[in-house]
Amino acid sequence: EVQIRHLSQPDFLQQVFADQQPQPGLLPLRGELRERVTKVLGHPYRGMRLRYWHSDEISAWIIDEKSKDMPMTVGVAVGPTGIVDLEILVYREPRGGEVHQAFFRRQYRGMTLSENDTLSGQVDGITGATLSVDATSRVAAMALVLHQVVMDRLPSR
């Protein structure tokens, strides 16, 4: 089994939150939210809840999603203006690993949710990595949905 670790969870959270101490949270995936996530991914999400971290306006999510045969682990940070950071933490396929490169990941910055919970922008694919690109885009859209739900539930400051 191929497993390439690009970034650890603590390093990803440090990159997103710098000197702030993010609050950890656990979001149950049920009811309408579970239906939205299933629609975004094109299949039901395996877990019943998702761990996340948040500060005042930013949430960070670490999500596993199947690429071709194996799951990849993606970290997505979302703020008031959309996606602020996207990292491939662990990649487990023999091909398509180019999705971890900065030129590809930068395309997601600033993307928000359009109607129907799709990404607001187009992503240029990578030849030979179509399934990994699609999986990354599904995770990005899922993180935007989850961020919206969490921010709506936080008490107003």
Where are these regions (language model features)?
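Flexible, solvent-exposed loop/hinge segments and secondary-structure transition points
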Residues: 1-134, 138-157
